[in-house]
């Protein structure tokens, strides 16, 4: 029975052993999923740090790493989906999280030095990018920045970077300068452009600004500022003598010239007499060969102080003269002021074709001279002398549209110096007022003063018969 039971219940047939029964879950078996999550987060963090640390400041990928080697390419794990989890470790063994190989960025170093390594990596990258931008800015290399530059000349051969502390040691013309801080990070970049190279600062253009002033017109031209027609100045080392404009006033000089039998050369100008003298010499007809037609016509005419202020000028063809037995009268019908002004200028141009200014413009300049003299508290006799200087130059045809204001200002300045007791402060104030009123540079005025003096033939002391008519009219108007 026992044998039958033993034979009837044979054991299992020999064969391959089956898998062991699953073990009960323990704390060691739950460790691998957490380690996988931490490892996935570490991969993503490392990929993000690698991407951020390789961003260049100038938009270009860095060419060299901190140690001079090229940076490795981005890890393949950062571009591919995460790999399947590895097989579970055998039961009873502690779960380990091995550090991924090939995923460390150049900025990462072993534990304990990671923070310092990242700071050093960022500092080196910033310095390298700043130096690369500095070299590109100094050498003007990138062609993409040409449309943003200020138009300064570009030197393609200049690609060398200079670190300077004193800008006076280098010539910064036509160059670009980049300012960096102590850590060599960019602060500012600018160019040095030449202004007015080879030109005077006081030079102005005729077509520069057309502002409407009380006397109208455009600004002073640099070509006509320092010259008058018929006036020759000693330029470019040329010696010019103005002795012909001087006449002897000492008796000894007169006798000495007579003893040698030398006759004084006649003056080719408008004759003038000394103040208080009753002798009036005849006008001379000779004229300098260097003067033009307008100057010849003006020099042959004797100056009349009542010519330009004649009240008959505005009448023109609009007046009607009635002659009676005992008196004569003039009747002027009503006419528009613009037509009256036009007719006056045409009549004046027909009588004085060599004068380049209109009569209305001449009178406007004289009104400005009088207004300026009132502001500076000048005496009426000073204004009268300035009128004589100005009208002489006008009738000689030496004034033009470009130099009329400079001539008027120079006449006021000469009259103030010769007839009033102005000190240095008073002369400075007068020059400031002239510069403000006539809108020219004081350097041009001072340079033009001698030109006007030569054009007047150094005759600043005037006879009474030339000054008194203007003085009477001014005292009635003041």
From Swiss-Prot:
Stored Pfam families: Cyclin_N (PF00134)
The residues forming the signal peptide are none
- Pro residues composition bias: which ranges? 11-24, 69-92
What species was this sequence derived from?
Homo sapiens
Cited InterPro entries:
CABLES1/2, Cyclin-like_sf, Cyclin_N
- Which key words are in the record? Cell cycle, Cell division, Cyclin, Phosphoprotein
**According to the UniProt entry, which residue ranges have a biased composition of type Basic residues?**
36-46
Start and end residues of each stretch annotated as Disordered = 1-121, 257-296
Which parts of the sequence carry Phosphoserine? 130, 208
- Mind telling me what this protein is named? CDK5 and ABL1 enzyme substrate 2
Describe its partners and assembly state: Binds to CDK3, CDK5 and ABL1. The C-terminal cyclin-box-like region binds to CDK5.
Matching Gene3D superfamilies: Cyclin-like
Q: Which gene encodes it?
A: CABLES2
Q: What's this chain's function?
A: Unknown. Probably involved in G1-S cell cycle transition.
The Gene Ontology biological process terms listed for this entry are:
cell division; regulation of cell cycle
């Amino acid at each position: 029975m026992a044998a039958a039971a033993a034979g009837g219940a044979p054991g299992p047939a020999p064969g391959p052993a089956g898998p062991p029964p699953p073990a009960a879950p323990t704390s060691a078996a739950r460790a691998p999923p957490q380690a996988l999550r931490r490892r996935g987060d570490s991969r993503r963090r490392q990929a993000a740090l690698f991407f951020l640390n390789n961003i260049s400041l100038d938009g270009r990928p860095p060419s060299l790493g901190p140690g001079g080697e090229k940076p490795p390419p981005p890890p393949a794990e950062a571009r591919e989906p995460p790999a399947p989890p590895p097989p579970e470790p055998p039961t009873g063994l502690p779960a380990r999280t091995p550090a991924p190989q090939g995923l460390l960025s150049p900025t990462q170093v072993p534990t304990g030095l990671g923070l310092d390594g990242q700071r050093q990596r960022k500092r080196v990258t910033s310095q390298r990018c700043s130096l690369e931008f500095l070299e590109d800015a100094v050498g003007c290399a990138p062609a993409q920045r040409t449309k943003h530059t200020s138009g300064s000349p570009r030197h393609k051969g200049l690609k060398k970077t200079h670190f300077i502390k004193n800008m006076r040691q280098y010539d910064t013309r036509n160059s670009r300068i980049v300012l960096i801080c102590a850590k060599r990070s960019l602060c500012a970049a600018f160019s040095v452009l030449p202004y007015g190279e080879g030109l005077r600062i006081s030079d102005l253009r005729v077509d520069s600004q057309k502002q409407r002033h009380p006397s109208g017109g455009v600004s002073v031209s640099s070509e006509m500022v320092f010259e008058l027609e018929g006036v020759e100045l000693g330029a470019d080392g040329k010696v010019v003598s103005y002795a012909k404009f001087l006449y002897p006033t000492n008796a000894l000089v007169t006798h000495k010239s007579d003893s040698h039998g030398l006759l004084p050369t006649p003056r080719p100008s408008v004759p003038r007499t000394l103040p208080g003298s009753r002798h009036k010499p005849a006008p001379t007809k000779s004229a300098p060969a260097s003067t033009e037609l307008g100057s010849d016509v003006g020099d042959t005419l004797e100056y009349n102080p009542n010519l330009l202020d004649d009240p008959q000028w505005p009448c023109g063809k609009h007046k009607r003269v009635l002659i009676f037995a005992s008196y004569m009268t003039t009747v002027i019908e009503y006419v528009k002021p613009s037509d009256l002004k036009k007719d006056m200028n045409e009549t004046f141009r027909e009588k004085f074709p060599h004068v380049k200014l209109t009569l209305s413009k001449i009178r406007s300049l004289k009104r400005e001279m009088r207004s300026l003299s009132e502001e500076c508290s000048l005496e009426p006799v000073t204004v009268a002398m300035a009128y004589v200087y100005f009208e002489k130059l006008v009738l000689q045809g030496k004034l033009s549209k470009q130099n009329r204001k400079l001539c008027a200002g120079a006449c006021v300045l000469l009259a103030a110096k010769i007839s009033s007791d102005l000190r240095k402060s008073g002369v400075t104030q007068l020059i400031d007022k002239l510069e403000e009123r006539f809108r020219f540079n004081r350097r041009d005025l001072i340079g033009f003063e001698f030109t006007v003096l030569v054009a007047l033939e150094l005759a600043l002391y005037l006879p009474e018969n030339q000054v008194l008519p203007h003085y009477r009219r001014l005292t009635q108007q003041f």
